[in-house]
Design a protein with these regions (language model features):
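Fungal secretory targeting signals
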Residues: 1-21
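Accessory carbohydrate-recognition regions in carbohydrate-active enzymes
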Residues: 20-179, 184-453, 457-500, 506-575, ...
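ATP-dependent phospho-/nucleotidyl transfer catalytic cores
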Residues: 580
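Short acidic alpha-helical/loop segments enriched in Asp/Glu that coordinate divalent cations
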Residues: 619-620
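Carbohydrate-binding surface patches
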Residues: 744-745, 757-786
């Protein structure tokens, strides 16, 4: 995601002062029998959910959280160490205090939260309702984070305000209310008043709360054990309680307490991106129902710090509720279901996913099984020996874990039948719908079209068609395909890369969605400018705009580029629109529109219109054809990065350089050797693989491996940039296997350098048949990728075979991967002539 506020500090002054990122050891299970549910964890032992939870600023933070849910779950549950908002997620690994456990729908660090709820245990004489008062200290060694359960030991005697001084903005929406940004260059934000405070943390606690958390798609299951080592008499003991934060500042919510049913339920309308995009879903609410295992001895509500005991219902801002339990209570379990449909649907989600009598262990096993069904399909052998903090197996499995969280299935069940009718709320129509299909949200498409969606065709093919149908639902409702959808369109980032996501599905054999409608949707992207196209800049986070689509398409269609003196990010837009045209042509051919496909393919050559032959860089142009300043017109990059942004026509790109492929190779060398590559942002992800396409696969192997070492590790600081809904991890997952989708609208993968000596992938049913498991080639099959020596000093490819058939070019077809039994790389200690396409 792009830089929102150039100099924004989020309170972490430096990890050199405030603590180092924790390594892979933080997730290691502390003794096989410490909890019975850690048995038979299989490959999940190699997943560290804390990777990407640390960074000194929002842009060098992966933006991930140690969350628990099932693959593609609507709601993720996480420990809360911070109030989240745009540029800050609920957890940061530098923090030493937990303020509760949050049901979050914030998909990425540069996106806003919506419809969250927070539950916090307490064991103090007076109820602590505010974030800054309910701090509970913990030690990193007492955390266990896995895909299926999170556990932590909390100091129940922590008192006072710890960790953060919260300004009004931080307690509400953060530094960007409504998600709106400023006109570029006119505003620079500072630290917004947040200073991190270090609290003293002892190594042992007199009274402690042992917390454990697991979660299904819509329901969190929390368990709190209250352990008192003070030997006080029963009369002296303090009653434990659970507080629930329903709303934050500036948002009015409702809450009710039902002691008979042992329930607390309510709703809030918070949607932090409310200023972005064309949609204003007035009736949006996030609903929840919490059901407790123990009876209440007392209860009440809170508005800010004001507690009202005995009140069983309230509405207002900074709204909360609490329930107390008998002083001798040792364990409390609470199951909290979330819905975007209604309170009744939240209660139904609870009864379907975690009915009364469901043990915590059962919930954990269900979630564990869901993740093992995905990650357990892959067996890795032959891993480079290195220190624990750079363990490639941990990075790889965690990467796949990250990638299989998105997009999120926002549909909700109506019965326990897996084939039941689904119900869901659409922010586009501001109404509830029913369908026999899932409905997916959280579409960070400018990021994920590059590799994440290709990954899903291999590891989750059963969901791909439904995802494409969700895109078309959005087109039906809004008249446009999404750019960055977070419940509704936000207009974040540029271009119409949903065109490429749909083309990716088609080129990978997925066709169980409406192809004529797909062509209608992408054709509109290609030929119909957005509303007020010539009147708006469409700058980053410009509030209250219509659907951005291809801003500047008016000039792009007039003379082949987006005018820099009329639209923001013009050069990046021109290059992206050229690629989008190539993707639209794929869809056109799929429906037999050959003439329009040919026209779009010709227009896909517009990238050459922003090539400055004098400087030999891509460059923004003004309306009169003159060149703009070479620092203008870019999105998360510069002239170096975007000169290589021609995913669909690398041969044509090479032809622009004097000397052709030789000239392009020299520019690539200067790019990497000069430190211009920015792997933390997505436009750089395909760049090292260009070497392979111009006859230098040995250089590709070197660059790919260097990036994998430099930009990834197995600690909480293990991502050099934002995860962006799986794209950062998808790059690593593919690269470690030995190939990457440079042109995601096509069916090709470009060879780099495999990291492992042997990988066995049990591909899901339907991977070879476009998601149709019942087809002739639909059953599961196991693909073995062999690369002997890859982990022991042989990084270069010397030869490649697919089921014994020699492959001379460094390119694999999707069909090769999903139908083959064995892909065998012959590896070498030094560069070879394999894959060279003539002299450079």
């Amino acid at each position: 995601m792009r830089l929102l506020v150039q100099n924004l500090l989020v309170g972490l002054l430096s990890y050199r002062i405030w603590g180092y990122p924790t390594g892979a050891d933080t997730t290691q299970i502390q003794g096989e029998d410490s909890r019975g549910y850690h048995a038979r964890a299989g490959v999940l032992r190699h997943v560290n959910p804390k990777i990407g939870t640390y960074g000194a600023s929002p842009d060098d933070n992966g933006g991930m959280i140690p969350s628990v849910s099932v693959p593609f779950g609507m709601t993720r549950w996480t420990p809360q160490t911070r109030e989240n908002f745009i540029s800050q997620v609920p957890y940061h690994d530098a923090d030493d205090f937990i303020h509760g456990f949050q049901a979050t729908h914030q998909p990425a660090i540069w996106m806003g939260e919506l419809g969250q709820v927070v539950l916090a245990p307490g064991w103090t004489s007076d109820v602590k309702s505010l974030f800054q008062h309910r701090s509970l200290a913990f030690l990193k060694k007492d955390e266990v984070s896995t895909p299926y359960v999170y556990e932590v030991l909390l100091d129940a005697d922590t008192e006072g305000e710890y960790d953060w001084d919260l300004t009004e903005e931080a307690a509400g929406e953060g530094p960007v209310p409504g998600g709106a940004g400023s006109v570029p260059g006119s505003v620079r934000e500072g630290a917004n008043g947040r200073i991190r405070k270090r609290g003293a943390v002892s190594g042992s606690y007199t009274r402690q709360i042992r917390a454990a958390l697991s979660a299904s798609a819509h329901t969190g299951h929390l368990r709190f054990d209250f352990e008192d080592n003070s030997y006080k008499s029963s009369a002296q003991r303090i009653q434990p309680y659970i507080s629930i934060q329903v709303t934050r500042r500036n948002w009015t919510g409702q809450v009710e307490i039902d002691p008979r049913r042992r329930e607390v339920f309510g709703s809030n309308p918070q949607r932090q991106d409310y200023r972005l995009g064309p949609n204003r879903p007035a009736s949006f609410q996030g609903y929840f129902v919490s059901r407790f295992s123990e009876p209440f001895t007392s209860y009440g509500t809170s508005l800010g710090a004001n507690i009202s005991e005995g009140i069983n219902g309230a509405s207002g801002q900074l709204l909360g509720a609490y329930v107390k339990f008998h002083a001798n209570t040792k364990r409390i379990e609470v199951r909290t279901a979330v819905s975007f449909v209604s309170i009744e649907q939240a209660r139904k989600n609870l009864d379907i996913e975690s009915p009364d009598g469901t043990s915590f262990e059962h919930t954990v096993e269900e979630v564990k099984s869901a993740w093992l069904e995905k990650l357990g399909r892959v067996t890795i052998e032959g891993v480079n020996s290195t220190d624990e903090e750079h363990d490639q197996r941990t990075i790889w499995y965690t990467g796949l874990f990250h990638a299989l969280q998105y997009p999120n299935d926002f549909s909700e069940p109506t019965s326990r039948d897996p084939k039941c009718t689904r119900t869901f709320y659409s922010g586009y129509t501001d109404s509830v719908h029913e369908s026999n299909d899932s409905y997916y949200q959280s579409w960070s498409i400018w990021d994920t079209y590059r590799a994440e969606h290709s990954l899903l065709t291999l590891f989750a093919p059963e969901r791909v068609n439904s995802m494409m149908r969700s895109l078309l639902k959005i087109f039906d409702w809004s008249g446009r395909l999404p750019i960055w959808a977070n419940m509704v369109e936000t207009n974040i980032m540029i271009a119409t890369n949903a065109d490429a996501v749909l083309a990716n599905a088609i080129s990978h054999g997925f066709r169980s969605f409406d192809l004529p409608k797909t062509w209608e949707a992408v054709r509109k992207d290609a030929y119909e400018p957005p509303e007020n196209d010539t009147e708006l800049l469409y700058y980053d986070r410009q509030p209250d705009t219509p659907h951005e689509a291809r801003a500047g398409l008016t000039s792009y269609m007039e003379h082949g580029w987006v005018d820099n003196d009329r639209w923001s990010e013009s050069a990046s837009r021109t290059l992206d629109y050229a690629f989008n045209d190539a993707a639209c042509a794929v869809v056109a051919r799929a429906v037999g529109a050959e003439d329009e496909a040919a026209a779009l393919e010709r227009r896909a050559g517009n990238y050459a219109n922003v090539w400055d032959s004098d400087t030999q860089f891509m460059r923004a142009r003004n309306a009169n054809g003159s060149w703009a300043n070479d620092t203008w017109g870019w999105t998360e990059g510069d002239k170096w990065v975007y000169t290589f942004d021609v995913l669909h026509d690398v041969a044509g790109l090479a032809a622009l350089f004097p000397g052709g492929r030789r000239g392009l190779a020299a520019r690539l060398d200067a790019h990497f050797d000069g430190g211009h590559n920015m792997h933390s942002n997505e436009p750089s992800h395909h760049v090292p693989y260009l070497y392979s396409l111009i006859g230098r696969p040995g250089a590709a192997a070197e660059r790919v491996r260097a990036l994998a070492w430099h930009d990834y590790n197995a600690t909480s600081a293990g991502l050099s940039g934002n995860e962006d809904l799986g794209q950062m991890s998808a790059w690593y997952v593919f690269s470690a296997l030995g190939f990457y989708p440079v042109n995601p609208a096509a069916d090709e993968y470009v060879v780099g350098s495999p990291f492992f000596e042997r990988v066995a992938l049990r591909l899901p049913a339907g991977a070879a048949t476009g998601g149709e498991a019942g087809a002739a080639d639909g059953p599961e099959r196991t693909l073995v990728i062999e690369a002997r020596g890859a982990a022991s000093g042989k990084p270069y490819v010397k030869g490649l075979t697919v089921d014994g058939r020699a492959v001379d070019r460094p390119v694999l077809r999707h069909r090769d991967i999903v139908t083959a039994r064995v892909i065998r790389f012959e590896m070498s200690e030094s560069p070879t002539s394999w894959g060279e396409d003539g002299e450079l």
